[in-house]
A protein has these predicted regions:
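Anion-binding alpha/beta catalytic cores of soluble intermediary-metabolism enzymes, centered on
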Residues: 1-193, 198-264
Length: 264
């Protein structure tokens, strides 16, 4: 599935392999003096074209992302960096993408535009030709006292004007309206997205993180995820992730890197 390059202090890598009863035979190890230098070295290898993706190991997320977003020698592009979960929930008939639950704390309108664009790109990569994007809030009407509803409406107009392409976008939608056709019908909501969403865009990180974890721990969902918007996909694993989730995230990175590139 992947050809790993292990980056960090060799002694720590070998100790971890011994604990996991894993062989390092044939694997490239790029040694660094300290663990915190591993992210910087990994970013440098990407910039030299030697790596196609990054995967967080035992480093803290902020150590990895600090090296990625550094203006002088990081991996930033014209896009805002964001995280997308791909969730397989038993009660939903298809894969569900949830964003952003890990990177952007309180994204503004411009950031949300890129968050939507990144999620559409990943949906395309996993075979959803024209994803249905639900912009979530607490209610399905535009309310002046709820800023996320105003931003949701603005994102829909951006899609109408060609500022976001590749998907059908509707919002604001409450969570039930986004995933349940019955709930959408009860509220009189008629759209191609309502009740049949492929992508759920949370109003902020707190809402997105809670939603994703509820689906995992209460609904028995399986997850994978990627950070997008950088030069290469970043597999940002959590300490709570099991082996299946980590492998699925590697598969996502492969699919994303192999996707057809469309100028937009």
């Amino acid at each position: 599935l992947i050809t790993p390059t292990l980056i960090g202090p060799r002694a720590k890598i070998e100790a971890a392999a011994q604990i996991a009863s894993a062989s390092l035979a044939g694997l490239e190890i790029v040694e660094t003096r300290h663990s915190h230098a591993a992210a910087e070295e990994a970013v440098a290898l990407v910039r030299r074209g030697q790596l196609d993706a990054l995967m967080k190991g035992s480093l803290h997320t902020d150590e990895v992302m600090r090296a990625v977003v550094r203006a002088s020698d990081g991996l930033r592009t014209e896009r805002r960096i964001s995280h997308v979960f791909v969730i397989d929930a038993p009660a939903y008939p298809k894969l569900l993408l949830v964003t952003d639950a890990a990177i952007n704390i309180a994204p503004n309108l411009d950031a949300k535009r890129d968050i939507v664009r990144n999620a559409i790109d990943l949906a395309n990569a996993i075979g959803v030709a024209r994803p249905k994007v639900a912009i979530l809030s607490a209610v399905e009407t535009v309310e002046g006292k709820i800023p996320s509803t105003i931003e949701a409406a603005a994102l829909c107009k951006m899609a109408d004007r060609g500022q976001i392409v590749g998907g059908d976008i509707d919002g604001p939608l409450a969570f039930d309206n986004a995933i349940s056709k019955a709930a959408a019908a009860a509220k009189g909501i008629t759209s191609t997205v309502a009740g049949d969403a492929d992508i759920l865009v949370a109003p902020d990180l707190e809402a997105g993180n809670i939603l994703a974890k509820e689906l995992v721990f209460l609904a028995g969902a399986n997850t994978a995820g990627l950070v997008l918007g950088a030069r290469v996909p970043i597999i940002l694993t959590s300490r709570a992730d099991d082996v299946a989730s980590r492998v699925a995230s590697c598969a996502l990175a492969q699919l994303f890197e192999r996707r057809p590139r469309v100028l937009a």
